[in-house]
Amino acid sequence: MEPCEDKCKRGLSLNFFEEDGPSLRLNSDSLDFLARDFKVEGMSQDNFDQKTKLYITEESLQKEVNIFLTKIYIRESEREPPQSHNSVFQLLSKIRNSVPNVSAFRNNLSILSKELSFFSFARHIHNRRLCWAEFIYCIRRGIKAIFKTTVQFLPTRLAKIFEKKASEVLKDNLLQTCNSKREGEVCDVKEPAVASSESSDCFNDMQELNNIVDLRDYSNSRFQQNRLLDRNLKGWIQGESEKALKGRRTTKRNDKENYNYPDFSNDNELLFSLATLIVENNPKKENIIPKYYLRYLQRLSRTEINKEIIEIEKLELEVVQFQMSIANLINTQVEVTNTIEELGLRCRPLPNENE
């Protein structure tokens, strides 16, 4: 049996230094221990699948989510982002087949769909780094939520083993990724990860990785300054805002060379949406946006603001429709004849390889 750590260390790799934007690769093998280390005693694998398998196919689930992501991202992008989100549902498939409990999986899927809706405002933002950082954040939240809810359905002894393994994988494998400012290379973990990984080169970069991923932590001024707005965009916003305070119109693009900002399709749309993203996801709303930024936004015409509100309402409707599609998918395709409690079966972990 191949040790879990040999696969886990290849689980997640991030690179924020590629020319065409950050990349994410999530390998479902990193959680293969879920399907391998637990089994149902007294029942063959075939019967196990027939009796307790959740009939939500990867294809049907991916179809719904791909439609959602297409509406949010791809329709306004010049180039399609890498289809990394497919790996999320390979991951869900592993968890689905390993924990034979209908309620747990239904709850987990609902949680994941809510997490996906968090980055809906990224539709307006053509900053690829920000979009993909939000996407990674949602994946992390979804994985943590899945682990948290499935543990409570396991017997006490198994729950402790499961929780320990999940914690090790999350902390020391999935999140153990280099954010090296020297070359932007992903760490090559040579040995199986352990809880005390201070000696690892990756360990010192984990906090920086968390700052990149956790977009809701706007109280971190260093993150806000260095990650939320890149230097060019921040300089352009400040310059445009100062002009607005002097009574100059801000819709012209005659200062592009001076500020060297990215070529967005609609500057006002970007600014309004970026402000919305910040305000909606930060409890300290009165302190997060500089006064000159707010004054600039106030100078937008009522027509422009109304257009933005309409777009956001359409987007919220798409999120609701997506969540309803997932709910319908669960109701129509989850066919479980009996739960593990009704079958009266006992779970136990597989013996270790050395035993």
Curated annotation (Swiss-Prot):
Domain of life: Eukaryota
Major localisation: cytoplasm
Signal peptide: none
TM regions (residue ranges): none
One GO location term (cellular component): cytoplasm
One GO BP: actin cytoskeleton organization
Subcellular localization, as worded in the UniProt entry: Cytoplasm
Keywords: Coiled coil, Cytoplasm, Meiosis
Coiled-coil portions: 298-338
Function description: Has a role in meiosis.
Name under which the protein is recorded: Meiotic coiled-coil protein 4
Species per Swiss-Prot/TrEMBL record: Schizosaccharomyces pombe (strain 972 / ATCC 24843) (Fission yeast)
Gene: mcp4
